[in-house]
Amino acid sequence: MAKKIDGYIKLMVPAGTANPSPPLGPALGQRGVNIMEFCKAFNAATDGMEKNAPVPTVITVYADRSFSFVTKQPTATYLIKKAAKIKKGSGETGKVSAGTIKQSQVKEIAETKMPDLNANDIDQAMKIIEGSCRAMGLEVVEG
């Protein structure tokens, strides 16, 4: 018989550096989840990822206070900023350019994010990532 689900918690947790401090501790503590157990399991699961990359995580809390979690790929904006070598996007999108990003870099990001995106093929995924780039004030160039 399946366990009864008590609720879901959606959090953005830095890869490999989960610790009981806020915002993670209070969010898990409210549901009665063993915080240290989650931190150890999460850090082990994100061991192969780049340290401190923001990882969207969905934690399923069961009625018996046990849990399971699903980690996704780091956020698209994080991957875009890393590829374009910028600290943040443009404050005035459409007026001030924050920089450029190559089509090949967009494809690489789209391939990484493909499992998390609502796209059927790589071309659709690239369009989604290009839209994020434009929203950040980046110009997508050939190459």
Swiss-Prot record:
One GO cellular component term noted in the UniProt record for this chain: cytosolic large ribosomal subunit
Single GO BP term: translation
Entry comment on modification after translation: One or more lysine residues are methylated.
Sample GO molecular function, one term: structural constituent of ribosome
Keywords: Methylation, Ribonucleoprotein, Ribosomal protein, RNA-binding, rRNA-binding
Keyword Chloroplast: no
Function: Forms part of the ribosomal stalk which helps the ribosome interact with GTP-bound translation factors.
Similarity field: Belongs to the universal ribosomal protein uL11 family.
Assembly information from the UniProt record: Part of the ribosomal stalk of the 50S ribosomal subunit. Interacts with L10 and the large rRNA to form the base of the stalk. L10 forms an elongated spine to which L12 dimers bind in a sequential fashion forming a multimeric L10(L12)X complex.
NCBIfam families in the cross-refs: L11_bact
Record-given protein name: Large ribosomal subunit protein uL11
Classification of source organism: Bacteria, Pseudomonadati, Pseudomonadota, Alphaproteobacteria, Sphingomonadales
